[in-house]
């Protein structure tokens, strides 16, 4: 049965049957550790690689000695406010040595501002919070592969892949010859390369490979006879057309593979080659005078302490690779699986940054060399030589435009957390969506405990983007490790010793599942145990090497938040995991009644809650800050974020959860953030749900909700939009932010202050002015009168036009904040901008028809109707249902978890506690029924009366079971009892149908219960046994036909809100070429009337409607103006003209050289005019005076055909998780 457990500030009853051996690690340590490594080691490595830089004569030498990072100029909050990058200055100590004179100059050189990672594992770049996603790439090393020739023969290939440098590929052909390709050039016999390495004669080569017949075959194909000839042959292949010499050939080969500056295997490449070829060359040892040694886990022996990995290729590597290839040809050895996580590694922030920094430094190195030759040697200093532009540019480019530097998904805390733990196979040096096949995307057995098999986007990126498992960590080589408990084989007991293994280390071990039953001392209870090796096998207990630490180690955080995951189909679980990340933070967050026990950890590590740094006592609590006197006597002040905007426009607001005088421990949550409730993740609300159809309103996954959810703000959320307006210098003079706007009445200006900026607290609607701004107009020749006015009134009469910032269509709300930045106050602004105003508008959005909702099991739907509370179905005690879901959504989708959640939720609500049911280790059906029974007893108070009456539980349940058998099923019995009651039978007859005997009823009556109470209590007990009860129609009060499943389910409101999607247009921008309205909400476009819609009108014979749609409502430019005028004047709409698309068609045909004319009925040629002529003519006819340079409104076309510039860089366009079903 469940046991209570303290989770943060709340107690949850845990239904888990296994104890947790290992706590979850810090969930964002992937990011933090990687960046820490970069600052401490990564930067130093790059400087060592590039240092020293020598000029072409070898006279001047520039060395990089040491580096320091200064303090950042602004805090994180200030950076967000001012749109600057959170960065610290990097200073490098540089030494310049002049070898001729022996002169040494040292200087500290500033190398640009380096972006810093925040506590939360993110970067602030130009004021926006960004995340660097870790990339899954193929590890450097040697790979063997086999293909089958059309003739049925196995052909083998071996590839040596470096971290950077030339590839070396070996392959065999049908005749068992071995060939090599150097850096993707044409193939040559492999023996040519062996000879070039210094094994010149045939005998030496044959001896090297034990006279293997395949090598002898290859030698027969080899036309070279000595080392020199082989070198020349290779040179000819690599540099065709250049005169080959032995020396140049030797230096080319050396620089390709054996020069650390040009070829780098990285530590991981050396480790992988060593692991595969096992030839013992791993380190280059430094001098070891003190004789200190360390134990090496890879070589399994003591080695000198001062050592470094050999990062370039060696002759042995090449020889051993060919030897292994020969082994494969002789049927020994194994080929590699490139989708195995032992062959794919993670490049996290640190390494990605290091590579980028290296690119910048190598560009700088070229500049330094050039400057060394040009500048005067005597006056030269390090500062003069070093140009930091390329370094700064490389870093800026990486953070600004790399595919792996992403705008952080901040919809809710889970979205933030998951984004930081995301693994992507895309990006530079990775795969591309188009080329990635099935195998790469598929779940692989090596993903177990490392990468979640469930959480991945639907759509083109499926399987290419994954999520790190809960307990996984990254080792020094970038491989993902997962923890196991070691099994003491001698005593056959599972110890608490934790061992982290990578995917290739794990191969060959037998690993038991976490839920294998153990006794008190940790020994296996069963003689045979389920295990992996790597297939699922049943083995004797004494063969087990390791055991999983927890059932949730397989899954990611989002997946492990789904209760009863074990009862859901994987496809639906995937949707559930992804949709939790789209849940909008609600005004009144509520932790789930049925959780999985990791809600607290997820919220804590996401960084949205405030955590006490030290233990102490709370001295002061306000809505904006908390003060704690710590145990050392100092005062710690914690500032809270109030109603700020997240990247996705949701509201970030923190509120204290501690009281004055309360004792606080270090690490305790002291303030809740968005979507958290007492430090636990709270993405939605617990609502009372019934699974039943209702008048067709929940057809096809639609959802019926009660008006109560609207009234009581169950699903109300706050959304904040940011609008900005800048005043720039133009050619005609500076723009001005002012309240003095031409042709605008006082009514419209009522909410602007004297600067022309809207006041905080104003309610605004579409079209309202937020910031008044005027821009100088082109000066025209002035008349004498105007010159006189100008002379009298000065500049004021100058021509300006209104370019104020207005609230866009379809947006409205309250102004919650205004920020003004100006040159005069010393704020950093882009060039040409004098003043910048930002206005923040907040909206309270209640739930409404068209909003998308979902549970945690992939059960999503759109609200079809909001029904008055009194019309909703109600329970026997009169409580109205809050949400009605369609039962048909369950069987075919196979996500039964939602039904179990509803039952357990009901029990938890009645018993008044929260429960946690961890994944694959949660509540069983028995324990759910047990909890429901307890709830029934508690609600009806039956137990105390039974004790008084001397009735025991077994007796009562036995009687009910008998009645159920008689009725045929539990549901049938409920129906029978309800029927008896409503058909006017006596209460006693109804009670007897539940199985109670007259004697039992008498005893209960003596104990103080009335017959009505006894019947009510028995109905509750029947509900507890089936999870179903009779509901009544709120409109008629009649009972529904069958008993219905009712319970509490956790529902989320997703970010696909109807307010963001609904859109209407009367007139608006037109496309430049076709003159048809643009499409889409972003462009304020029209609705597409497509081919099929046209067919429909044709089929109806609606000729005039059709003509209008194809002409005046679309691209008949003149007709549009005339029709508009006719409507305004109340006249009849004139005949349509020629649509622009027809003119375009004619122009296209003419451009093909076809002479196309348009003829009238009497064969007269009709002249097709251009738009400008047309408008001019029309204007004349209508008597409109068009001054020069002014066209009517209609022509103000929006030049972006489809997508506005802002949208080009709008994250939503590039967000990999777009939901295909919703964004059609």
Swiss-Prot record:
Enzyme Commission identifier(s): 2.7.7.6
GO molecular function: DNA binding; DNA-directed RNA polymerase activity; ribonucleoside binding
GO BP terms in the entry: DNA-templated transcription
GO CC annotations on file: DNA-directed RNA polymerase complex
Pfam families in UniProt: RNA_pol_Rpb2_1, RNA_pol_Rpb2_2, RNA_pol_Rpb2_3, RNA_pol_Rpb2_45, RNA_pol_Rpb2_6, RNA_pol_Rpb2_7
Keywords: DNA-directed RNA polymerase, Nucleotidyltransferase, Transcription, Transferase
UniProt keyword Transcription present: yes
Keyword Nucleotide-binding annotated: no
Reaction equations catalysed: RNA(n) + a ribonucleoside 5'-triphosphate = RNA(n+1) + diphosphate
InterPro entries attached to this UniProt entry: DNA-dir_RNA_pol_bsu_ext_1_sf (IPR042107), DNA-dir_RNA_pol_bsu_external_1 (IPR019462), DNA-dir_RNA_pol_su2 (IPR015712), DNA-dir_RNAP_su2_dom (IPR007120), DNA-dir_RNAP_su2_hyb_sf (IPR037033), RNA_pol_bsu_bac (IPR010243), RNA_pol_bsu_CS (IPR007121), RNA_pol_bsu_protrusion (IPR007644)
EC class of the enzyme, as a word: transferase
Family: Belongs to the RNA polymerase beta chain family.
Record function comment: DNA-dependent RNA polymerase catalyzes the transcription of DNA into RNA using the four ribonucleoside triphosphates as substrates.
NCBIfam families the record matches: PRK00405.1, rpoB
Xref: PANTHER family: DNA-DIRECTED RNA POLYMERASE I SUBUNIT 2 (PTHR20856)
Subunit field text: The RNAP catalytic core consists of 2 alpha, 1 beta, 1 beta' and 1 omega subunit. When a sigma factor is associated with the core the holoenzyme is formed, which can initiate transcription.
Name listed for the protein in its UniProt record: DNA-directed RNA polymerase subunit beta
Organism, as annotated: Pelotomaculum thermopropionicum (strain DSM 13744 / JCM 10971 / SI)
Underlying gene: rpoB
């Amino acid at each position: 049965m469940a046991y209570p457990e303290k989770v943060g500030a709340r107690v949850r009853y845990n239904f888990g049957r296994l104890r947790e051996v290992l706590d979850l690690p810090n969930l964002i340590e992937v990011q933090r550790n990687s960046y820490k490594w970069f600052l401490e080691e990564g930067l130093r490595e790059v400087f060592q690689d590039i240092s020293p830089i020598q000029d072409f004569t070898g006279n001047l030498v520039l060395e990089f000695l040491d580096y320091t990072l200064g303090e950042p100029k602004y805090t994180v909050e200030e950076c967000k406010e001012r749109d600057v990058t959170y960065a610290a200055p990097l200073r490098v100590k540089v030494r310049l040595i002049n070898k001729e004179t022996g002169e040494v100059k040292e200087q500290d050189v500033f190398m640009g501002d380096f972006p810093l990672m925040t506590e939360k594992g993110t970067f602030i770049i130009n004021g926006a919070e960004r995340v660097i996603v870790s990339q899954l790439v193929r590890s450097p090393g040697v790979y063997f592969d086999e293909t089958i020739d059309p003739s049925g023969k196995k052909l083998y290939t071996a590839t040596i892949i470096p971290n950077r440098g030339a590839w070396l590929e070996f392959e065999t052909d049908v005749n068992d010859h071995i060939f090599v390709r150097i850096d993707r050039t044409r193939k040559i016999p492999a023996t040519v390369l062996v000879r070039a390495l210094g094994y010149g004669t045939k005998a030496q080569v044959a001896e090297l490979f034990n006279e293997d017949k395949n090598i002898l075959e290859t030698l027969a194909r080899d036309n070279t006879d000595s080392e020199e000839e082989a070198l020349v042959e290779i040179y000819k292949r690599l540099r065709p057309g250049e005169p080959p010499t032995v020396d140049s050939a030797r230096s080319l080969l050396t620089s390709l593979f054996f020069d650390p500056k040009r070829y780098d295997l990285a530590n991981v490449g050396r480790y992988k080659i060593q692991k595969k070829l096992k030839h013992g060359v791993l380190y280059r040892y430094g001098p070891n005078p003190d004789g200190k040694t360390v134990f090496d886990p890879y070589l399994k022996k003591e080695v000198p302490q001062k050592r470094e990995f050999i990062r370039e290729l060696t002759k042995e590597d090449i020889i051993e690779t060919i030897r292994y290839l020969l082994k494969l040809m002789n049927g020994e050895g194994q080929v590699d699986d490139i989708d195995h996580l032992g062959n794919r590694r993670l490049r996290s922030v640190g390494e990605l940054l290091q590579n980028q920094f290296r690119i910048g430094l190598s560009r700088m190195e070229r500049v330094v060399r050039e400057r060394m030759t040009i500048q005067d040697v005597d006056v030269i200093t390090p500062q003069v030589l070093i140009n930091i532009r390329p370094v700064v540019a490389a870093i800026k480019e990486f953070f600004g435009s790399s595919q792996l530097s992403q705008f952080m998904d901040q919809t809710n805390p889970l979205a933030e957390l998951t984004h930081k733990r995301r693994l992507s196979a895309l990006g530079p040096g990775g795969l591309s969506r188009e080329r990635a096949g099935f195998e790469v995307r598929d779940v692989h057995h090596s993903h177990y405990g490392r990468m979640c098999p469930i959480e991945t986007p639907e759509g083109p990126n499926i399987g290419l983007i994954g999520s790190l498992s809960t307990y996984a960590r990254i080792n020094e080589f970038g491989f993902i490790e997962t923890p196991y408990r070691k099994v003491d084989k001698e005593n056959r007991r599972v110890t608490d010793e934790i061992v982290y293994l990578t995917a290739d280390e794990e191969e060959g071990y037998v690993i038991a599942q976490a839920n294998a039953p153990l006794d008190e001392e940790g020994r296996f209870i069963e003689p045979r145990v389920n295990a992996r090796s790597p297939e699922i096998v049943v083995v004797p207990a004494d063969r087990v090497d390791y055991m999983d630490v927890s059932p949730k180690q397989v899954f990611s955080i989002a997946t492990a938040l789904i209760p009863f995951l074990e009862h859901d189909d994987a496809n639906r679980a995937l949707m559930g995991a992804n949709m939790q990340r789209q849940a909008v933070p609600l005004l009144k967050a509520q932790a789930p009644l049925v959780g999985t026990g990791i809600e607290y950890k997820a919220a804590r590590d996401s960084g949205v809650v405030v955590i006490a740094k030290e233990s102490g006592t709370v001295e002061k609590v306000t809505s904006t800050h908390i003060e704690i006197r710590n145990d050392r006597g100092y005062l710690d002040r914690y500032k809270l974020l109030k109603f700020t905007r997240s990247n996705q426009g949701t509201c970030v607001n923190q509120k204290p959860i501690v009281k004055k005088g309360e004792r606080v421990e270090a690490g305790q949550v002291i303030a809740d953030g968005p979507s958290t409730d007492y430090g636990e993740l709270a993405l939605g609300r617990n609502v009372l749900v019934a699974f039943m159809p209702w008048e067709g309103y929940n057809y096809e996954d639609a959802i019926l909700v009660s008006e109560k959810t609207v009234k009581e703000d169950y699903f109300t959320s706050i959304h904040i939009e940011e609008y900005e307006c800048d005043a720039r210098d133009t050619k005609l003079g500076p723009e001005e932010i002012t309240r003095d706007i031409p042709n605008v009445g006082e009514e419209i200006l009522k909410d602007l202050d004297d600067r022309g900026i809207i006041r905080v607290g104003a309610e605004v609607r579409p079209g309202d002015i937020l910031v008044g701004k005027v821009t100088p107009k082109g000066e025209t020749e002035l008349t004498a009168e105007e010159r006189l006015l100008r002379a009298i009134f000065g500049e004021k009469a100058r021509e300006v036009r209104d370019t104020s910032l207005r609230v866009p269509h379809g947006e409205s709300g309250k102004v919650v904040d205004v920020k003004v930045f100006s040159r005069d106050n010393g704020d950093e602004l882009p060039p040409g901008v004098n003043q910048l105003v930002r206005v923040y508008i907040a909206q309270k959005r209640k739930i409404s028809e068209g909003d998308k909702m979902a549970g945690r099991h992939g059960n999503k739907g759109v609200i079809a109707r909001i029904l008055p509370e009194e019309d909703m179905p109600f329970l026997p005690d009169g409580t109205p249902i809050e949400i009605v879901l369609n039962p048909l959504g369950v069987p075919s989708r196979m996500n039964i978890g939602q039904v179990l959640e509803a039952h357990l939720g009901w029990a938890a609500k009645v018993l008044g506690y929260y429960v946690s049911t961890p994944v694959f280790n949660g509540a069983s059906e028995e324990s759910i029924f047990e909890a429901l029974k307890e709830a029934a007893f508690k609600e009806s108070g039956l137990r105390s009366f039974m004790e008084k009456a001397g009735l025991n539980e077994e007796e009562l349940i036995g009687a009910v079971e008998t009645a159920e058998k008689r009725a045929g099923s539990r549901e049938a019995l409920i129906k029978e009892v309800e029927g008896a009651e409503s058909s006017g039978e006596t209460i006693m007859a109804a009670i007897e149908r539940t199985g109670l005997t007259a004697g039992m009823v008498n005893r209960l009556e003596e104990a103080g219960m009335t017959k009505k109470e006894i019947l009510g209590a028995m109905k509750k007990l029947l509900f507890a046994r089936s999870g179903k009860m009779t509901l009544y129609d709120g409109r008629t009060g009649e009972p529904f036909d069958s008993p219905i499943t009712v319970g509490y389910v956790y529902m989320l409101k997703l970010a696909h809100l109807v307010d963001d999607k609904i859109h209407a247009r009367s007139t608006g921008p037109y496309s430049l070429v076709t003159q048809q309205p643009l499409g889409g909400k972003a462009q304020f476009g029209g609705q597409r009337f497509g081919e099929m819609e046209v067919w429909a009108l044709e089929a109806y014979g609606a000729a005039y409607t059709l003509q209008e749609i194809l002409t005046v409502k679309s691209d008949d430019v003149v007709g549009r103006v005339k029709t508009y005028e006719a409507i305004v004047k109340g006249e009849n709409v004139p005949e349509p003209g020629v649509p622009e698309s027809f003119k375009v068609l004619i122009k296209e045909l003419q451009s093909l050289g076809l002479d196309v004319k348009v003829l009238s009925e009497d064969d007269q040629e009709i002249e097709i005019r251009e738009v400008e002529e047309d408008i001019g003519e029309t204007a004349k006819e209508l008597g409109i005076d068009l001054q020069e340079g002014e066209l009517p409104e209609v022509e103000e076309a929006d030049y972006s055909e489809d997508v506005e510039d802002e949208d080009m860089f709008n994250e939503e366009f590039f967000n990999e998780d777009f939901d295909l079903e919703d964004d059609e």
